[in-house]
Amino acid sequence: MEFKVEYKSANARACRIKTTHSEILTPAFMPVGTLAAIKSLDAIDMSEILDAKIILANTYHLYLRPSSKVIKQMGGLHGFSKFDRSFLTDSGGFQAFSLNKISKPDEEGIKFKSHIDGSLHYFTPKSVLDAQYDFNSDIMMILDDLVALPASKERIELSLKRTIKWAKEAIDYHKLKQNQGVGMGQNIFGIIQGGTDFEARRICSQALCEMDFDGLAIGGLSVGEENEVMYDTVEAMMPYVDNNRPRYLMGVGTPEDLVENVARGVDMFDCVMPTRNARNGTLFTSFGKFNIKKAEFITDHSPIDSKCSCYTCKNFSRAYLNHLFKAKELTFFRLASLHNLHYYLNLAKQMREAIIKNEFENFKKEFYRQRTC
């Protein structure tokens, strides 16, 4: 993977990442395709209409169904889904933890039951990489020990111990596999844990920065803490996160979260929010968000956002979308998802342009001003 910080505006960064399958300009938002598909959209929508350079898929779900072996047989995620740009796959540890009441992390990994058929499974630092080698994802995430917030000091210390141990096992295993000719075009990111404890974040950041990861992710935030707590935690740990590698904040977030964390030096984001909200009728715009189901839109000729150039806004009215949503017409999911994802991807482009011009602070002020109009 090639990586370069091209421009800065205060702490905000505009970077260039080159993988085997695409070139990614940051700040970058990654649409979430849990099952190797963005809900209601296909590979053509993602590449030709939205021009997404990278999407995220989920190791836990794909490992269970259809299985990593089936995906490998079908040509990896790219051959299977026909999305020919970059894939980032998470380790599945979060899902193993959050979807299973009986999940049991220990010193070697995480035991869990399949939410599909109840079968027992065990994720280890090596096994989650083996699945991702089968996927041939461009960026692989390591297994980490997630801390549910709020957490005791003892639980955070245990999480750090496991996360650092598993990170070392993962990077050593990846080097071994590459020496054997496996995963040659694949990259591996470490995940920094520590809850909202600044000292724990510093310790974990420094430990992982000493390892030869291609990029560094911030995990364990946006899990119920107040927004300001998340922002303060990111800001406190950034001095200890390597400047010369991509920085990825996992599972974040709202448009405001993206702007605030880009201001603090984050490069990459993913979140289900744009597509999940789209399916519930909530649409993002330059002036905030609104729900299309309201009666005021029944005869509204205007597009979702007059400043938006997406496929949906160029072709359809609020009135039509209001009708589709109330009629439970499946077409609504596609049109709303196209709009919301375009909004997020375009927000990332606008932030990049502002950073290149060294005007990010002005962009941020205007971003919030429009939301109060």
UniProtKB/Swiss-Prot annotation:
GO MF: metal ion binding; tRNA-guanosine(34) queuine transglycosylase activity
Region (RNA binding): 251-257, 275-279
Gene Ontology CC, one term: cytosol
Cofactors: Zn(2+)
Pathway: tRNA modification; tRNA-queuosine biosynthesis
Top-tier EC class: transferase
Top-level lineage group: Bacteria
Pfam family, one: TGT
Active site per UniProt: D90, D270
Reactions that this protein is recorded to catalyse: 7-aminomethyl-7-carbaguanine + guanosine(34) in tRNA = 7-aminomethyl-7-carbaguanosine(34) in tRNA + guanine
Name of the protein: Queuine tRNA-ribosyltransferase
Species assigned in the record: Campylobacter lari (strain RM2100 / D67 / ATCC BAA-1060)
